[in-house]
Amino acid sequence: MRRITWCVAALVAIAFGIQVGNARVYGKAFEKATHGKVALKSCDVIGFGPDGVLLVGDGAAASIYAIQTGEGKSTKQLTGTITGINAKLAAAIGAKPDGIEILDMAAHPTSGTVYFAARKQDDKIPLILTVNAAGEVGLFNTDSVEYARVQLPSKPESKITKVSDVAWVDDKLIASAGAAETFASKIFIVKTPLTHDASGELHSAETYHVAHGKWETKAPMSTIMPFQEDGKTYVAGAFACTPVVKYPVEALKADANVKGTSVIELGSGNRPLDMFTYSKGGKEFVLANTFRFHHARAPVGPSPYWTVKFERGLLDEEQNVNEKAVWRTKKGTPNSDKITVVEAYHGVTQMDRLGETNVVALRENADKTLDLAVLELP
């Protein structure tokens, strides 16, 4: 009985990275972690890795933090709509409804808890808030947690300015970021399992911007997404003005400058926010939401925030790429029946997958208040 009990304890330890006897045992995410306070300087972006590990991009510290949340699988998920979620999140920290800025949002892959990267407006302190399946708002306390910090190479002449996205791809942690230099668009690769205080590899990304008709190095990669093509792993990145570009992960070598392949052009005047794959009706799609900074002069819909759905197979294109990449529209009219605007998602400022059939979305209303809504995948 004692042996069985120990084995069960060991399995729990492997899942959550806890102490068994005198040994520290970790899951897929960590090779070596540490315990203590995560003192964030910024909270640019969040995401999740294996075992529900929370990934936090801290551009001000040129670091990525991987933090154990302690959450397991839940049989319940958030449903319906929580109106005025911005006021409820602010109230959790004693602030007025306009007292916080929501920077990013991600759903825990097993518990369904929604995490928010936020910043207080008065003192600019970064923090992480949560909403559970019951709609209860909480503050995620990072004062005493199991975590690993990965340092991103940052020199005075190429200082990291912001981490724009993080993703766990096979056995690698990948982050996109901006730097203050000619090759401003950066991709960072970190081998996993993670070791506390390890450093990531630096790559400079060069991209053909279809709408601009030229190769560029400064435009930031706003969001990244892993996918498989012919047995190889790729990272798809969406940039401002708005090409969707793919990079083979095997081509990302240390200190190398890499050229991506532009496969789709969503149109100039947009900044992508979130992007992920999903399946529906036996077909694979990609869902991406964007902020249109040319909304006043050329709106896509009633809100500057709009969402597009396209067939996943478009990412596999090898011939019609870069200068020949397919456009979402031409002269203001739809150009491909494989790329469609999702009108039901107008106003969505942040979104993430919630299970197999739904999306949890932060939606902006006409009065600038925010609702948290569970929507069906289109």
Regions found by a protein language model. Give the residues of each.
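Positively charged n-region of N-terminal signal peptides that target proteins for export
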Residues: 1-4
